């Protein structure tokens, strides 16, 4: 199908490569892209016909290198699921520090699929191959670069990107313990180090994010893997014990979070 469409429209180019995961495919696409801006659409999803036109308009209007629109998720029966991230009500520019704060509070959208980005943002670093939660990893790197490559993100209202929810995806399969929980913790440690250097006023929020990701790991790991020879599991428990007092004083952790921490330890 893709080859046939490419034969009918010279604007479409199709490449065939060995499956190396989403990051590998995206990085390959970035190497082939010839335009000034890039966007990403997952194979199961679809976008409104004017999505990229609206995103480009926001970039032109604000001068920001990145624009974002809201998304919704649709199940296999066509039902719209509750919002993961609430779209903005009005067009606005969210500064890099504010956008990062929203990500760390689990309110922001790290997906590159809802964004249009200037291609040169990927010159320094691209998607981490072999890792899950790769969008969060790269976006945080962009938001915390010393040269302030992304001073802010232009956000427009509406939900123009539509996610087809697959419960058996790499991060959602309930029948196996996804590696994403460990990758989330590694990303949390990375962002804490970056925040301490770039935005120290967000340090306690970043610490809260790391505690939250570790609690999420312990809530999902199978009992059979809670063993002394599981080095990562031992590390998670050790980190929570070492950070317990700071967590108890953290204003961004809820009472429920703190009760859960005490119960799991």
Segments from the language model and where they lie:
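Glycine-rich, basic loop-to-helix element that forms the pyrophosphate-binding segment
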Residues: 1, 17-33
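Acidic donor-binding segment of Leloir-type glycosyltransferases
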Residues: 1-16
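Short aromatic/hydrophobic "clamp" motif used to bind/position activated sugar donors
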Residues: 38
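The conserved acidic donor/metal-binding loop of glycosyltransferases
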Residues: 42-46, 65
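Conserved donor NDP-sugar-binding/catalytic core segment of glycosyltransferases
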Residues: 50-83
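Membrane-interface aromatic/basic loop that binds lipid-linked glycans or pyrophosphate carriers
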Residues: 64, 223-265
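Short, flexible, basic/aromatic active-site loop/helix in glycosyltransferases
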Residues: 70, 86-107
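Conserved nucleotide-sugar donor-binding catalytic segment
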Residues: 97-184
């Amino acid at each position: 199908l893709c080859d046939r469409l490419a034969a009918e429209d010279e604007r479409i180019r199709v490449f065939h490569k060995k499956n190396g995961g989403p990051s590998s495919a995206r990085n390959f696409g970035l190497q082939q892209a010839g335009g000034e801006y890039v966007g990403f659409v997952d194979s199961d999803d679809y976008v409104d016909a004017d999505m990229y036109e609206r995103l480009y308009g926001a970039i032109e209007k604000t001068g920001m290198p990145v624009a974002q629109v809201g998304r919704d998720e649709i199940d296999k029966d066509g039902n719209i699921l509750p919002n993961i991230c609430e779209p903005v009500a009005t067009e606005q520019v969210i500064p890099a520090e504010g956008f990062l704060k929203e990500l760390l509070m689990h309110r922001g959208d790290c997906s590159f699929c809802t964004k249009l980005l200037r291609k040169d943002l990927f010159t320094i670093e691209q998607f981490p191959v072999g890792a899950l939660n790769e969008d969060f990893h790269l976006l945080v790197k962009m938001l915390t670069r010393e040269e302030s490559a992304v001073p802010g993100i232009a956000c427009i209202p509406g939900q123009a990107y539509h996610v087809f929810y697959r419960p058996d995806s790499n991060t959602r399969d309930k029948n196996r313990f996804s590696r994403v929980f460990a990758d989330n913790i590694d990303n949390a440690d990375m962002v804490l180090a970056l925040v301490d250097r770039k935005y120290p006023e967000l340090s306690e929020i970043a610490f809260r994010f790391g505690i939250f990701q570790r609690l999420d790991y312990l809530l999902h790991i199978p009992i059979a893997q809670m063993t002394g020879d599981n080095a990562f599991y031992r590390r998670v428990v050790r980190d929570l014990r070492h950070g317990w007092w700071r967590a108890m004083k953290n204003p961004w952790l809820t009472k429920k979070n703190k009760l859960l921490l005490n119960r799991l330890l």
